[in-house]
């Protein structure tokens, strides 16, 4: 099933959809296609908790019942700047 996500970083907001069975790493690849930053320079968060690249979106709590087109799941995005990641 599809999940719908709002990915936010500062003033940038991306609306994306993915399969509930997609991994967090696969979501990072989608973001890479849009923002041109590789997955290793990205960190994704849900409710201020860092998401594990190997987990599926469903395992992270983004289910088709929760992340709807009219009420998408919110994902925080941080980029690596120099040696550290920026705050969300």
Where are these regions (language model features)?
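Ubiquitin system architectures
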Residues: 1-88
């Amino acid at each position: 099933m599809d999940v719908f996500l709002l990915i936010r970083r500062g003033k940038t907001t991306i609306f994306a959809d993915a399969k509930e069975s997609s991994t967090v790493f696969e979501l990072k690849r989608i973001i890479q296609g849009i923002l041109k930053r590789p997955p290793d320079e990205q960190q994704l968060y849900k409710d201020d908790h860092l998401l594990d690249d190997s987990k599926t979106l469903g395992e992270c709590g983004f289910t088709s019942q929760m992340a709807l087109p009219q009420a998408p799941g919110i994902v925080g995005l941080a980029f690596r700047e120099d040696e550290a990641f920026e705050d969300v």
